[in-house]
Amino acid sequence: MKHTVSASVILLLTACAQLPQNNENLWQPSEHISSFAAEGRLAVKAEGKGSYANFDWTYQPPVETININTPLGSTLGQLCQDRDGALAVDGKGNVYQAESAEELSRQLVGFKLPIQYLHIWADGRRVAGAPYRILPDGILEQYGWTVGRTADSGGQVRTLQLNNGNLNIRLVFTEIGMPSETETPERCAARTR
């Protein structure tokens, strides 16, 4: 009898451990994403080569600005999106513009990066109205990218991992909160220079 109870408990625990995960509530469609300011580290791997940098990212609709910095804090470049399109400013002050951040990234680095969706995916949501698939492990597939996300106990993003087969991007968030600016900008700061 003792062995029967032990075997039953083991079978029950094994069965529970193998129940399929309910992914229905993962990656809900995007609605209004609140403003935020974040800092962290960024790693990009392409064709066996990797690059690392720090980032600070401010999302205040309609403006989104991502600064890429060296580990010592020098700015390597800035990407900004607003209603007028996207622009990038390199460390030498050269300005590049395009209709979208995706097109701008294709022009500058040769890859269409899904920059215009990062704030949605970082919030744990999918782009509403666009085709998607949620894999059994909870990974989102959208726009040709697999998107994984980890969060802290309060639901704030800790890591965001993107992969399209050729390019792997990993953002590790060390701080996330509200922007310090009290006024919401209407345009990218680089447009007003």
Curated annotation (Swiss-Prot):
A lipid is attached at C16 (S-diacylglycerol cysteine). It is a lipid-anchor. CDD domains: LolB. Pfam families: LolB (PF03550). SUPFAM superfamilies: Prokaryotic lipoproteins and lipoprotein localization factors (SSF89392). GO terms for biological process: lipoprotein localization to outer membrane; protein transport. Residues 1-15 form the signal peptide. GO terms for cellular component: cell outer membrane. A lipid is attached at C16 (N-palmitoyl cysteine). InterPro entries: LolA/LolB/LppX, OM_lipoprot_LolB. It is found in: Cell outer membrane. Disulfide bonds: none annotated. Transmembrane segments: none annotated. Keywords: Cell outer membrane, Chaperone, Lipoprotein, Membrane, Palmitate, Protein transport, Signal, Transport. Monomer. Belongs to the LolB family. Plays a critical role in the incorporation of lipoproteins in the outer membrane after they are released by the LolA protein. This is Outer-membrane lipoprotein LolB. It comes from Neisseria meningitidis serogroup B (strain ATCC BAA-335 / MC58).
